[in-house]
Design a protein with these regions (language model features):
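Detector for outer-membrane/organellar transmembrane beta-barrel domains
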Residues: 124, 137-225
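Transmembrane beta-barrel strands of outer-membrane/channel proteins
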Residues: 26-30, 59-63, 88-90, 127-133, ...
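Outer-membrane beta-barrel proteins
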Residues: 32-38, 63-64, 76, 106-108, ...
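Gram-negative bacterial Sec-dependent N-terminal signal peptides
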Residues: 1-22
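Repeated loop/turn-to-beta-strand initiation elements of outer-membrane beta-barrel proteins
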Residues: 22, 53-58, 82-86, 123-129, ...
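Outer-membrane beta-barrel "beta-signal"
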Residues: 150, 176, 204, 228, ...
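Residues that define the transmembrane beta-barrel architecture of outer-membrane proteins
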Residues: 36-44, 68-74, 110-116, 123, ...
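Outer membrane beta-barrel
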Residues: 21-28, 39-134, 140, 149
Length: 262
């Protein structure tokens, strides 16, 4: 609550709230748990975002498992130039990822993004420093991330690294995407994590409009999982249906969800 109040005050002084946009969604997701039972997860999310041209900020509030409203993410920052900005808050990481709405991202590395951080964007380069604990020492960083992306004609390429300061460990990721046409896209993410037994892993996704399909694996088994999903909207209603199939265990993991935006 203290962080939420402080952020609202900061946004007000920055003039961001004068042009704030408030949006929300009601979501219902159906997934299969470890006991092979289908469970339903309901959530309500609110997003308040504003940009005064110089200062910007956002607040995301959602319901938890106890049906309590909690602060999910927040950020406040400044646009230094047209291509450079800096922000602080509980923000998502910048590491290259994959997967669909729920399924996917089975084999590729996915460093934890939990915690407050500072993010700087300078053109095609993004830098993120995640704090260990801002309540005890705001000068102590846990991890440093960097990401670079660019596009050439129909190709988009990217590279990122996650560095853990205490252990000096690095996790690397690279991506390439090819826009076949306006509705078809083929992308591949490759990661390297020396802390894993199988250090190199990949995921390739083919998207055709609302339909997506993927295959993934690692250096021990280059074809571990396949999956597919369909995601679309109808007026203010969004919905998705997808499933993952493990080629070794022959286990199917389905997921589905609907959301209403307001």
């Amino acid at each position: 609550m203290k962080k939420l109040t402080a952020l609202m005050i900061a946004l007000g002084f920055a003039g961001v709230t004068q042009a704030a946009t408030i949006s929300g969604t009601v979501e219902v997701d159906i997934t299969e748990n470890s006991s092979n039972d289908y469970i339903s997860t309901e959530s309500i999310k609110f997003d308040i975002a504003g940009d005064s041209g110089v200062a910007f900020g956002s607040i995301k509030v959602e319901t938890n498992a106890s049906d309590q409203f909690v602060l999910d993410e927040y950020s406040i920052g400044a646009n230094i130039t047209e291509t450079a900005s800096v922000s602080y808050g509980e923000q998502s990481d910048i590491f290259i990822g994959g997967g669909l709405e729920v399924v996917g991202s089975n084999t590729i590395a996915n460093p934890s993004d939990a915690g407050e951080s500072i993010i700087a964007n300078i053109g095609a380069l993004s830098l993120r420093g995640k704090f260990t604990d801002t309540d005890t020492d705001i000068s102590d960083f846990d991890t440093i991330q960097a990401k670079w992306t660019t596009s050439v004609d129909k190709f988009s390429v990217g590279a990122s690294v996650d560095h853990t300061i205490a252990t000096d460990d690095n996790i690397y990721a690279g991506s390439v995407a090819f826009a076949v046409n306006e509705s078809a896209n083929l992308s591949t993410v490759v990661t390297h994590d020396a802390s894993q037994t199988d250090e190199v892993a990949y995921e390739s996704i083919l998207s055709l409009g609302s339909l997506s399909a993927y295959v993934d694996g690692d250096e021990a088994d280059w074809s571990k999982n396949v999956g597919a999903g369909y995601k679309s909207t109808w007026k203010d209603l969004g919905y998705y249906v997808e499933a993952n199939y493990n080629l070794d265990s022959e286990e199917v993991t389905p997921a589905a969800g609907v959301s209403v935006s307001f």
